[in-house]
Every structure is written in C-alpha cells, then in structure tokens.
Amino acid sequence: MEVPHEAVLLRIFTGADDRCGVEQPLYMAIVMKAREMHLAGATVLKGPVGFGQSSRMHQRHFFGADDSPVVIEICDAEEKINAFLPVLDEIMESGLITLEKARVLQYGHKRSGYLERLKNSLHHHPHHGSVDSREKQNL
C-alpha cells in the first residue's frame, strides 16, 4: 500500500469501556473497519488516566473494570481519511476526533539512505522545514 508523503493523521479519543453494539469494544470496531476499508494502518494507544468533556476521570480500576482512555491513530491520504469519517459518525456516540497534517517519512520497507537524505534536505532549509520539489525527486 502506497502512502503519500503528505498525509492526514486522524486521532480518535474514547474509552476502553465504550462499545459498538453489545459485545465489541469501540476501538476494535474502528480498527476493524479501517482495515476493511484498506486504510494504511491503525494503532490503539491505552493511557493510564485521562478525562474528557464530562471531566470524569477515566482509568483502569483494581477489580477488573477498565475505563482507561484510548486513542486510535490512523494516518493515510486525505481522501481516504475523509471517506472514513462517515463511518465514525455512524458508530461513535461520543468522543473526540481530531485531524492534522502529517509528513510521512517512512512506510513499509526502508529504502537505503532515505531518512538521511531527508534529514539533510530539511537541515538545508531550516526556516520553512519543507522539502522542495527537486529534493523530493531525489528521495
């Protein structure tokens, strides 16, 4: 799967105890749907503690209940992320969703010297931090 250099990072903030239907955790439903729609990848991050709109503390409790904060990150082309947003709207009842621009440096197998060339090209343009079109061709 090819991921463009300029991409969008989608972050979904929810809780470990949030559900999609009766059985499936919401974070699993989101990851499975992202996979089904051939998005580049998804990662679930569990935090030890957090709070959201309600200001209620979310955390793992000693006696098995897990209300830990969960963040799902998905990075892909803007068009693919935009196509995924209606799915989230359908399956999520609450939570926070953010989007931000991302520059993909590596995806899949590493090409020899790629990161070093990118670092050098960014080092030569410290004021704007971007790689011009001539340098992109060399990457």
Regions found by a protein language model. Give the residues of each.
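Positively charged, small/polar-rich N-terminal and surface patches that mediate targeting and assembly
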Residues: 1-139
